[in-house]
Every structure is written in structure tokens, then in C-alpha cells.
Swiss-Prot record:
In the RecBCD complex, RecB has a slow 3'-5' helicase, an exonuclease activity and loads RecA onto ssDNA, RecD has a fast 5'-3' helicase activity, while RecC stimulates the ATPase and processivity of the RecB helicase and contributes to recognition of the Chi site. Its EC number is 5.6.2.3. The gene is recD. A helicase/nuclease that prepares dsDNA breaks (DSB) for recombinational DNA repair. Binds to DSBs and unwinds DNA via a highly rapid and processive ATP-dependent bidirectional helicase activity. Unwinds dsDNA until it encounters a Chi (crossover hotspot instigator) sequence from the 3' direction. Cuts ssDNA a few nucleotides 3' to the Chi site. The properties and activities of the enzyme are changed at Chi. The Chi-altered holoenzyme produces a long 3'-ssDNA overhang and facilitates RecA-binding to the ssDNA for homologous DNA recombination and repair. GO terms for molecular function: 5'-3' DNA helicase activity; ATP binding; ATP hydrolysis activity; DNA binding; exodeoxyribonuclease V activity; single-stranded DNA helicase activity. This is RecBCD enzyme subunit RecD. It comes from Buchnera aphidicola subsp. Acyrthosiphon pisum (strain APS). GO terms for cellular component: exodeoxyribonuclease V complex. The lineage of its organism: Bacteria, Pseudomonadati, Pseudomonadota, Gammaproteobacteria, Enterobacterales.
């Protein structure tokens, strides 16, 4: 097994850390060595635990390399009773004592993952009390916010936040999550007898910028008195800033011994939050704080291990308990589908609302059609993409050097309006908005189809056409119109990770990068004081999360990568509001959708 796992590292099936962890756990026991490597590897892909069925059905490393799987099976005994064999080993326990791995309810965990999951679900079970509300008053508030007669899942979501102490609101792009946040804030303030402390937060600086836009919405003037406006939060903050997390130690200033003084905490883009961060959030708030989480569980998961939102959403289809159903019906005046959840996990499903209606894409939209087909694995619709039969979506093959060159030329043509605005000396706002209409997205950083080389190739093409002219500052290449993306939050310069600005020269001849802020003002930063940035003709899908563009180009690598999966593809596709160009090999595209990424069951 040792030799095989070493080979797996060379073949890039697993990471070096997965190999070393397996050796740390068990140097001689083939079964435990394999299990340790699998758990470590799959945790890096967002899975909190692995069911025993994963091993019984030989899904090792979610690999499609049949030769490699067969070699593993030859080393193992023909018939293995996995739970019995695992619990024989000293490094695996049942959670009663600290062991590197834990086997619990036919699932195997890293100890820290098991501990965090246990704490989170214990919190959901014990702390989610139902709030005593003025039903007549709350029902009237909901009626004012949602005057339409048709059933609105947004209304159900807002009702749940009034009833529950913890609520999870799930929805894809265009399902009205932003509108729902607005109406939640209005409903909570209007229903409260006193002034309340509300805080909005998100995992990234870019996402908090979006929340700050919500707080500046004029709709609050229509609903609130001057006294009620005092309950509006002044600004959104990142989760790290909110909890006072130290950069090196990762310890939180706020914790169970020093709780945040809040009545309501609303966290957006919760899909980016990993299981360990979720545990920190829950341990830092008081038992009376109302928690509202909002996100899309189909989007890319967190960079760190463990997609807790996906785990929680597993229970979404179970329906509401009878008690919750009655409460929702009384508040909303709706008649809900009588699918009553009698399971012991209804303390989770009672807190979930899935926003189903899409307000951004109508059902004839190409983006909606393709993204929906990908998750439902509708082969006929997906294959119709290849002959460009899906509205406003264009597929280009990238199997040859000639096709690659055409891709670069095609992309450059989409910047004609941007360059024209620069040459005609349009306002900086107009120039930035023109750039923001079109964005190139890549899956990877490196390689021929990664952001680093794509950015270089685009610059080379523009240089050959005399579109850009280089000059050097401190040995670095610059040119007018160069797009720059910030990669670290910088509060002193008022820029966030993911912000994109455009290089220009001001009236005094100083080279600067200009960023369009949420209030439509321009933030100009001289190049000489700018730090931590990258060229941004192309950015990764991960960096684009939370953004949207009218026109998007999505570039897939020319090989199967563990980073390229259905979630990445879905996230990339749904960044576009209207037009999408996909550059990919057909086989790679199909394999990304149909490969066995969902064999790991909760």
C-alpha cells in the first residue's frame, strides 16, 4: 500500500499531505493506511466524513483510474468488514477519546471534523428555541412586504426568521436572496418592541461590499421611522473582523467566554464558510442572538475543509414538522404541502427555506437551461450545447493550437468597446463599467488554460495589435487600461480581496489604478503604494464567486483536474447574466458533469 500511495501522489490522484497523514496513522496496516489517505484527501474536497459504503463500493479517492483501483483491491482481502477492522486499530475510536480518526454511525471522520460537526448539530438541537411573537402584528408586516397573492418562498423565509432563532435560506443566482435580506431586516426591526442590534457579515471583503450596498437601499426610508432607523447596521464586516480572528494563531477574540453583543447576526455567502469557522461563529454568540445564514449550496464550497452548508441542506427535502408548518401557515396565510416531517432531524429541516423561483433568468434563458441541465444530468440538453443550440451560449472546442489561438483572438474582440472608451477619454466610471460587462474565467491558476498564461497570451495579442504600449515602473510592466485585481483586503486603501480596478494616468501624470465603489464614486490609488494584486483579464472561478457579468467566457483545462467538478462548472456558468462562451474539450466538459463526484453520501 505504501508504494501504491506514493504512486498516487506522483499521478496527482492524492496530495503529498494525504500520503504523509496515512503514514503517520498506520505504517503497516494496509486498510487503515488507505482509509486515512482517503479521509484526508476527500476532506480537502469539502467532505466532512466518508460513509463505510464509500469503502465497500471501492470509491477510493473518487478516482476514475480503474487500473489504480484494481491494484488497491489486490492488496486488500477479498471480503472486509470495514467497521470491525477499523475499530481494531488504536488510531480509530468512537469519539469517546481523542483519536486521529473517528468511526461514528457508519461514517469515518478526522477527529477535528467529528468534534466540530457534533458541536454544531448539538447547538442546532439545543439552542434553536421558537420565538414568542405577536402573530397579528407579524402577519401584517409580512402582508405589507409581500402584497402579491401567489405563494412566495421569500415570504416563507422571512416568516422563518421571525419564528426561529436559527434560519438557513438557500437559493441559486437570481432567486432573490438580496431582496430577502432587505425584507428580513425590515421585518425584524418592525416586529421588535425595542431597538435591536443587527450585524451583517460575509466571508470575504467583496461579499461585504455587496451587503453594504443593501444597507444603502432607499427602501428603508419607505418603511422606517427615524427611531427605527437606529436599528439599521451601519456597515457590514468580514467574519474574521467580526470575530476578531488573529492571522497567525487563528484564535478568536470573541468566543463562548466573550460573546458578541448582538440581537441578530446575518451571514451571507455561507457556502464559503467551512465547518471549523461555523463552529467558531456559533460559539461566539449568546443564546439569545438570532442567526440567519444565506447562500447557495450548489456553488463552490469553502477553500478550507468541510462544507457544512451542504451537510445541512441534505435535510432540506425532509419538509417541516407539523408544529412548524402550522406556525408558517398562520403567519403567511399560505396552505403548505402536507408533507409532514416526523424524523428526529426535523430540528434542522424546520430551519431551512429553499428559494425556488428565479427572478433573474426566465425558463427560456440559456444560462438557466444549462445550469439546470448540469445538476439534473440531462444529457440531451447538455449535448445540444455542442452544436450551439442553447440560447446565448456558445461552445468552442480547444483541441488544437489553432483553436487555442482563435480563443485568444475571440476573447480580445470582446474588449473593443472598453478600448474605444479609453481612446475617447470617457469617464473613469464608464470605462470601468465597460470592463465589468465582460469577464474571462478560468478553473486553474497554472497551465496553458490557467489564468497566469491566459493573461499573458491576451496581453501578447493586444501588444501585437498595438492596443497596449508597455512602460516600466520599478521593473514591473504597466500599460494604460491594465486591469488589476486585489488579492488581499487593505482597509487603509479601502480595497477588498477580489476588487478589480483599471490602470490610468491622472491629470498630474501619476500612474494610478481606479476602483468603482458601491456608491458610484471612484477610489484612485497610485501604483507606487499598491500591494498584493494580479493582472485580471482572466480570473479564477473561485475569485468570481459572488460577482455577476453580462457576458462571460469560461475556460476549462485540457485535462481532468480534481478542482474541475460540477460545482466549479455551475459557479462559472451562473456568473453570467446573459451571454456565455465556453472554451473546452467536449470529453472534458461531459466528464466534469457525469464523473462520480456525488458517490460520497451524507
Amino acid at each position: 500500500m505504501l508504494i501504491l500511495l506514493k504512486k498516487a501522489v506522483k499521478l496527482k490522484i492524492i496530495r503529498p499531505i494525504d500520503f504523509y497523514f496515512s503514514q503517520f496513522i498506520a505504517q503497516k496496516n494496509n486498510i487503515v493506511m488507505l482509509v486515512a489517505a482517503c479521509v484526508s484527501y476527500e476532506s480537502s474536497r469539502g467532505y466532512i466524513s466518508l460513509p463505510i459504503k464509500y469503502f465497500e463500493k471501492h470509491y477510493f479517492f473518487s478516482s476514475s483510474n480503474e487500473v489504480f483501483i484494481k491494484k488497491i483491491l489486490t492488496l486488500l482481502e477479498k471480503k472486509i468488514n470495514w467497521p470491525v477492522e477499523l475499530l481494531k486499530h488504536a488510531s480509530i475510536g468512537n469519539g469517546g477519546t481523542s483519536t486521529p480518526l473517528v468511526l461514528h454511525k457508519k461514517k469515518i471522520y478526522l477527529y477535528k471534523m467529528w468534534k466540530s460537526e457534533s458541536n454544531i448539530f448539538n447547538y442546532l438541537y439545543t439552542k434553536n428555541k421558537k420565538n414568542k411573537i405577536n402573530q397579528k402584528k407579524c402577519s401584517k408586516i409580512l402582508e405589507n412586504l409581500f402584497p402579491q397573492k401567489n405563494m412566495s418562498f421569500q415570504k416563507i423565509a422571512v416568516a422563518l426568521t421571525l419564528i426561529n432563532n436559527i434560519t438557513f435560506i438557500i437559493g441559486g443566482p437570481g432567486t432573490g436572496k438580496t431582496t430577502t435580506i432587505l425584507k428580513i431586516i425590515i421585518a425584524l426591526i418592525k416586529s421588535s418592541k425595542k431597538s435591536i442590534k443587527i450585524q451583517l457579515s460575509a466571508p470575504t471583503g467583496k461579499a461585504t461590499t455587496h451587503l453594504n450596498e443593501i444597507l444603502k437601499n432607499n427602501i428603508f426610508d419607505l418603511y422606517f421611522s427615524e427611531k427605527e432607523k437606529c436599528s439599521l447596521p451601519s456597515t457590514a464586516t468580514t467574519i474574521h473582523q467580526l470575530l476578531g480572528i488573529q492571522k497567525i494563531s487563528q484564535k478568536s477574540f470573541f468566543n463562548k467566554s466573550n460573546c458578541l453583543d448582538l440581537d441578530v447576526l446575518i451571514i451571507d455567502e455561507i457556502s464559503m464558510v467551512d465547518i471549523l469557522m461555523m463552529e467558531k461563529i456559533l460559539s461566539s454568540i449568546s443564546k439569545n442572538t438570532k442567526l440567519i445564514f444565506i447562500g447557495d449550496h450548489n456553488q463552490l464550497g469553502p477553500i478550507e475543509s468541510g462544507s457544512i452548508l451542504r451537510k445541512i441542506c441534505y435535510y432540506a427535502n425532509d419538509g417541516y414538522s407539523f408544529k412548524s408548518m402550522i406556525s408558517i401557515e398562520k403567519l403567511t396565510q399560505y396552505k403548505l404541502c402536507k408533507k409532514i416531517n416526523k424524523k428526529t432531524t426535523n430540528f434542522i429541516s424546520d430551519n431551512i427555506c429553499v428559494l425556488n423561483k428565479n427572478y433573474r433568468f426566465n425558463k427560456n434563458s440559456g444560462i438557466y437551461t444549462l445550469s439546470n441541465a448540469i445538476f439534473k444530468k440531462k444529457t440531451r440538453i447538455i449535448e445540444s450545447l455542442f452544436d450551439n443550440s442553447i440560447k446565448n451560449i456558445f461552445f468552442y472546442e480547444t483541441n488544437s493550437s489553432e483553436q487555442y489561438k482563435k480563443m485568444i483572438k475571440n476573447i480580445c474582440l470582446n474588449y473593443e468597446d472598453f478600448w474605444e472608451k479609453i481612446y475617447k477619454k470617457a469617464t473613469m466610471k464608464e470605462i470601468i463599467e465597460s470592463f465589468q460587462n465582460y469577464q474571462v474565467l478560468c478553473i486553474l491558476h497554472d497551465g496553458l488554460f490557467g489564468v497566469n498564461i491566459i493573461n499573458k497570451k491576451l496581453e501578447e495579442n493586444m501588444y501585437k495589435k498595438n492596443i497596449i504600449k508597455y512602460f516600466y515602473i520599478d521593473g514591473e510592466e504597466w500599460y494604460i487600461g491594465k486591469p488589476i485585481m486585489i488579492i488581499n483586503n487593505n482597509r487603509a486603501l479601502n480595497v477588498s480581496n477580489g476588487n478589480i480596478g483599471i490602470t490610468n494616468i491622472n491629470k498630474n501624470g501619476i500612474l494610478q489604478v481606479s476602483f468603482l465603489k458601491e456608491n458610484n464614486t471612484i477610489n484612485n490609488i497610485p501604483v507606487k503604494i499598491l500591494r498584493n494584486y494580479k493582472t485580471a483579464w482572466a480570473i479564477t472561478v473561485h475569485k468570481s464567486q459572488g460577482s455577476e457579468f453580462m457576458n462571460t467566457a469560461l475556460i476549462l483545462p485540457n485535462f481532468n483536474s480534481h478542482i474541475l467538478n460540477k460545482d466549479t462548472l455551475y459557479t462559472g456558468i451562473t456568473r453570467s447574466r446573459k451571454i456565455l462562451s465556453i472554451f473546452s474539450d467536449k470529453k472534458i466538459f461531459l466528464n466534469t458533469i457525469f464523473k462520480n463526484t456525488n458517490k460520497i453520501l451524507f
